Regions:
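Active-site HxH/HxHxD metal-binding segment of metal-dependent hydrolases
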Residues: 1-11
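Basic, nucleic-acid-binding surfaces and adjacent catalytic neighborhoods in DNA/RNA-processing proteins
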Residues: 108
Length: 108
């Protein structure tokens, strides 16, 4: 059995879930660690497809269903209010320092 939660709910340990424009995808905020767990909506350097060396980039638009990159940026903007140090991604290298700066760049 799994417990259901909604984006915005506070989970054990103060963890928060943030909705994204990608259907079924959330970003988790771990406040004690000042870490975002971004799943598939953000990609780190070297991630396929593309394999660019940008520290952080948006997932390919085709992964978003009917949403666009603009929709994704808008859904992620509330994360800019957080004191992010690290961004963990499912694809590519994580951001282990200056996470907020990397997030600001990708959402600009």
């Amino acid at each position: 059995m799994t417990d259901a939660f909604a984006a915005g709910d506070e989970l054990p340990g103060g963890i928060r879930a943030f909705a994204t424009a990608r259907p079924g995808e959330v970003v988790y905020w771990l406040p004690r660690q000042r870490t975002l767990v971004a799943g598939d909506v953000l990609l780190g350097a070297g991630a396929k497809p593309g394999g660019t060396q940008e520290p952080l980039r948006l997932c390919p638009e085709r992964w978003l269903g009917k949403a666009t990159h603009d929709d994704l940026r808008e859904s992620l903007r509330p994360l800019l209010d957080l004191p992010v140090s690290r961004v963990l991604v499912s694809h590519g290298r994580p951001i282990l320092r200056a996470g907020k700066r990397a997030l600001e760049e990708v959402l600009s």
